[in-house]
Structures are given as C-alpha cells and as structure tokens.
Design a protein with these regions (language model features):
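HEAT-repeat alpha-solenoid elements in large eukaryotic scaffold proteins
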Residues: 71-84, 150-160
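Amphipathic alpha-helical scaffolding segments comprising HEAT/armadillo-like alpha-solenoid repeats
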Residues: 60-68, 90-106, 131-139, 175-185, ...
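N-terminal "cap/leader" segments of large eukaryotic alpha-helical scaffolds
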Residues: 2-75
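Structural detector for internal amphipathic alpha-helices that build alpha-solenoid repeat scaffolds
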Residues: 20, 24, 37, 46-58, ...
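Short inter-helical turns and helix N-cap capping residues of alpha-solenoid HEAT/ARM repeat scaffolds
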Residues: 73-76, 110-115, 189-191, 222-226, ...
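Extended, charged low-complexity segments
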Residues: 243-341
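Acidic, serine/threonine- and proline-enriched intrinsically disordered linkers and terminal tails
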Residues: 112, 119-182
Length: 341
C-alpha cells in the first residue's frame, strides 16, 4: 500500500474518490486511452520502451520490465506474460494495456519461443468482469463503449480506483490498431495460435466488418473442430458488439447443421443464444443436451471463452448450458445435496 501511495496515479484516483469529475482528467497524462493512442508506430516496432510513460499507471514499472525481459528472451515466460495476466486477474489493467502492442509484435515473431504465451495474454486487458460469467446477456458482452466515454461505464473502477473502462478501451484500441498484424495468425500452423488470435481479434472494433470477414474466410479452410468452434464464437462476439442480422442467422444455421462437428454446433448454439433474447427453441435445447457430454465439455476447455466462463466446479460449457438453458438448477456449491451424491 505504501508503494501505491507513492505511485503518480494515486493522486488522480484519490481526487476521484474525493469527488473530482472523471471527465476533467480525460485526455491527460493519466488517461491510458490517450497514452496508448499517442504511442508512435516506430516505438512499437522498435520496442522503444523508454518512450512509453509506464510509471503513470499502477505498477507500470513491473509491466515495462516484464515486456523487456520477454522481448529479449532473458527470462522464463512466467516472468513476462505472467505479470500482465496476474495484474489483470487482480483487476489492474491500465499499465497492462500499454503492453498490448508489444505483446502483439512478440506473438507475430515466428522465431520467438514464447509467442504463444504473449498472444494468450494480449486480450487480457481488453476484457474485464468476465470470470465465471456464462449468461446469455453477459458472456460475449462488451460492457463499455469502444469510443471515448469520459464518464464511468459498466466496468466501474479497478481495485486502485482507476476507471476500468478506460483500461479496457485502451487495450481494445491497441488491438484494433494492429488487426493487420493479428489476422495472419488465423492461418498459423499452430492451432493454439489460431484460437488465441481469434479470441484477441474478437475484442477489436470492427465497424467495417473486416475482422468478422476474416473469421468466416478462415472457417472455410479450417479443419480442426475446436478451432472452428473458436472462429464461430469469435464471430458471435464481434457480432454482439456490432450487430449484423445476416450473421446472426448464419450462426443459427451452424448449430442446426448436423454435418458440423459437435464442438462447432455447441459453440454456435451458445453464440446464437447470446445474440438473441427470445426463448430457446426446442431443437436447440435437444441439440445441446445431446452433445454437451462431460467429455466434450473438457475438450472445449481449449477455448478461452469456456475457460473464463467456468467456475463452482463446472467447466465453461457446463456452466453455460446450466445458466442459459437450465437456470432453475442450482450452482454446484449451492446444492445442499451435492456432497451426498
């Protein structure tokens, strides 16, 4: 706590607690959205880390050091990406958002030994409030406006008092700025890279639908069922953020198509439920209840959406099915008879 009180951002957060208007700080040196937008392309490509004001944000010096070590390959991966992921898990994303452009460049370096780990962490600052979330309303929801919003949004504040929506918006803007670097990773030989590229790209602002088109293009060539499932979920997430009725209809066709792999049908069913608000049709219920076996639920843990949706002893798929289709059932920890079975 003493270290945090010495942090330059502490005065900003203290002022907010004391009643200062958030809008009065927008665009200033402690607005991570403005800082990310101001990072020069040459700074990103050349890893000129000293040009980035890391210390303007909580634990920024740790993030800068982690990016440096990861870039130079001088540390175990846990000392690099682990810092970014750990801070996001602890609800501190502002400095982590500054790392996003550099993590993307590490991920696109085919010779880097930790590129997969860097890519897996790229979207961590771009998501918040998603641990254990498996409802139709919230699973694929982008709670904040990706445009500048100088007031608090549904993300609220981080544990430091910093506006969480600013951090998320900054991270998504960084991903959006580098979609041209990320999209080729959808064709990477490594299926884990393809999955995590889709997961990261799904957070991008996609008003021209180019990202969604890239998902559909890759899907036409993709043979791996679990990667196909990832592409369907990514398409649904992008469509949730930028509605497109024709794509919603297409997602419905995927879970109705009996020639699709079970993982694809399940991903499409979940995605379609998140894109609509009517009662789940009987044929969808029957399809999901038939396909959502325990074995398949564990297979689908390869999808980051499912990893973060899980909780209370349930896999992500199990939690989604219960929450979306069987809300009358209690959570495992809330079932007083569970220990007797």
């Amino acid at each position: 706590m003493d270290a945090w009180r010495m942090d330059p951002t502490f005065a900003m957060c203290e002022a907010l607690v004391d009643g200062a208007e958030l809008s009065s700080l927008a665009g200033g040196p402690f607005d991570v959205r403005a800082v990310v937008a101001g990072v020069r392309p040459e700074t990103k490509d050349g890893f000129l880390l000293d040009e980035v004001p890391w210390t303007h944000f909580p634990q920024g010096d740790r993030v800068r050091e982690a990016v440096h070590l990861l870039h130079t390959r001088d540390s175990p991966v846990s000392d690099g990406t682990g810092v970014v992921g750990g801070m996001c898990a602890n609800d501190m994303r502002a400095a982590a958002a500054l790392a996003v452009p550099f993590l993307i460049r590490i991920a696109t370096d085919a010779r880097h030994p930790h590129r997969a780990d860097a890519l897996a962490e790229t979207s961590s600052p771009a998501r918040a409030g998603h641990f254990g979330v498996a409802s139709r309303k919230e699973l694929l929801l982008h709670r904040g406006d990706t445009r500048y919003n100088d007031d608090y949004d549904d993300y609220g504040v981080e544990v430091t008092g910093y506006p969480a929506g600013w951090s998320v918006t900054a991270a998504r803007a960084a991903i959006t700025a580098d979609t041209a670097l990320l999209q080729p990773l959808l064709d990477d030989p490594d299926p884990i890279i393809r999955i995590d590229a889709a997961y990261a790209l799904a957070t991008a602002t996609d008003r021209d639908h180019s990202v969604r088109t890239a998902f559909r293009t890759r899907l036409a060539a993709e043979q791996d069922p679990i990667v196909r499932a990832a592409l369907v979920l990514a398409t649904a997430e992008a469509t949730r953020a930028h509605p497109h009725p024709a794509t919603t209809t297409w997602v419905r066709e995927q879970w109705r198509d009996r020639t699709q792999a079970p993982e694809v049908c399940l991903a499409a069913a979940i995605g379609w439920l998140c894109l609509t608000d009517g009662a789940a049709p009987n044929d969808l219920r029957a399809t999901v209840d038939h396909l959502a076996t325990d074995e398949r639920a564990h297979v689908m843990e390869a999808l980051p959406w499912m990893v973060f949706a899980g909780g209370s002893g349930e896999t992500g798929l199990q939690r989604c099915v219960r929450t979306m289709l069987h809300p009358e059932l209690p959570e495992p920890d809330d079932d007083p008879w569970a220990l007797l079975l």
